[in-house]
């Protein structure tokens, strides 16, 4: 495909957050009741945590947010300026400006809604032994309005795109926006993809998630989220392969594409279910001493996967690209990457 064919081919919508990342100790995790390998929304008890992190530990500030990470990684893998675009809500403040600069430098075409009254959202990333836990204080990210999406200059991004990716986290913010995008995708034979994102989404936002399920052509998630999904739906199995098959067989709103379920399992093989069959793909092994942190690993996997999907590549290539991207990211702090990919 000519590079002009890739113009705005992939659109992401989600919660743009500034990652406040630090290697912490067990005492800190216990104090704030934080479990590793989890993602939650901040409660009042977590609010002093962000300041305490910056006082006690060596903190890094990295532009993040699950969907934004994936879109940036896809953009990096594609190496075609303007191939991706992204919408979400930030505050009118220095963090928001930093986010804009970072995403634009990454080559992503961003159309943020800017909320006058609320600060840009942050996400505490607590790292211990290479594992991460996410505590998101959405702030401005929670203020995205469907009216912003409906503006002609923003809806034009929806019309231009052929692939859509929305993390499950956005279900807590603007289900109306997701509805407009998924219905457009189904009506125009475009590819709509989502992520389970976190156990709490599967558990406490089950109803809004269920409304999206028929529209999902690809469902991404990790083993913990898949097992929570299974429990919440009364499937009575913890077997990730069985869960992946069941998810791929849930009813579809449009018959254009069969649904594919893609479940990552950390260092264990990636499980892919389609057509009632399961395939497993090994990840790239990494010696423990090379692991910096797993923050952004799942996001990077999706970004790599989507970069090949928009090229029309088969599942095997998409998974290989996903594994490559996440392997790069876990050797660095946060969801960051070198200037150019080395994927061929």
Swiss-Prot record:
Its cofactor is Mg(2+). InterPro entries: Adenokinase (IPR001805), Carboh/pur_kinase_PfkB_CS (IPR002173), PfkB_dom (IPR011611), Ribokinase-like (IPR029056). GO terms for biological process: adenosine salvage; AMP salvage; response to trehalose-6-phosphate. Pathway: Purine metabolism; AMP biosynthesis via salvage pathway; AMP from adenosine: step 1/1. Widely expressed. Inactivated by the begomovirus AL2 protein or the curtovirus L2 protein. The active site is at 299. Pfam families: PfkB. One of its GO terms (molecular function) is adenosine kinase activity. Its EC number is 2.7.1.20. GO terms for cellular component: apoplast; cytosol; plasma membrane; plasmodesma. Keywords: ATP-binding, Host-virus interaction, Kinase, Magnesium, Nucleotide-binding, Purine salvage, Transferase. It catalyses: adenosine + ATP = AMP + ADP + H(+). ATP dependent phosphorylation of adenosine and other related nucleoside analogs to monophosphate derivatives. Essential to sustain methyl recycling. Interacts with the begomovirus AL2 protein and the curtovirus L2 protein. Belongs to the carbohydrate kinase PfkB family. This is Adenosine kinase 1. It comes from Arabidopsis thaliana (Mouse-ear cress).
